[in-house]
């Protein structure tokens, strides 16, 4: 069991159970999965950029990333159906907890002028999406060796039914929300 999962079971579950008056600890919202996505519009013309992004996302996540391909052709973007346009990886269970721990405690504090994560990334059902402008904030990435800084979307999918439940869950886990 990972450090963050221990914190969830021992500290977060009782707090949420008391706050929302749940009868059972099984009703308490939990985290289902974390999805990481890098969208590369220029990758359709530059194959080297795609390979680099795949390697870097695999290193950050600790799990092999897959290429996402265009579903439709769009002439104005010079895009054909089936062309690579990005890469993604979905983390569950132990890798998910390890990644969240790394994100909250190491990566986010390394962001320049970091004042907290804005809480407007909730979708109305308790899931949270966060955009990162530079993937070099992760400890596995050596900032001086990164040629093309890439942004990424991180989506945390929870079993929470409302944004209030989801925000309290992530807040108790240590997500540094903006005050």
Curated annotation (Swiss-Prot):
InterPro entries: Ribosomal_uL5, Ribosomal_uL5_bac-type, Ribosomal_uL5_C, Ribosomal_uL5_CS, Ribosomal_uL5_dom_sf, Ribosomal_uL5_N. GO terms for molecular function: rRNA binding; structural constituent of ribosome; tRNA binding. Transmembrane segments: none annotated. Keywords: Ribonucleoprotein, Ribosomal protein, RNA-binding, rRNA-binding, tRNA-binding. GO terms for biological process: translation. GO terms for cellular component: ribonucleoprotein complex; ribosome. Belongs to the universal ribosomal protein uL5 family. Part of the 50S ribosomal subunit; part of the 5S rRNA/L5/L18/L25 subcomplex. Contacts the 5S rRNA and the P site tRNA. Forms a bridge to the 30S subunit in the 70S ribosome. This is one of the proteins that bind and probably mediate the attachment of the 5S RNA into the large ribosomal subunit, where it forms part of the central protuberance. In the 70S ribosome it contacts protein S13 of the 30S subunit (bridge B1b), connecting the 2 subunits; this bridge is implicated in subunit movement. Contacts the P site tRNA; the 5S rRNA and some of its associated proteins might help stabilize positioning of ribosome-bound tRNAs. This is Large ribosomal subunit protein uL5. The lineage of its organism: Bacteria, Pseudomonadati, Thermodesulfobacteriota, Desulfovibrionia, Desulfovibrionales.
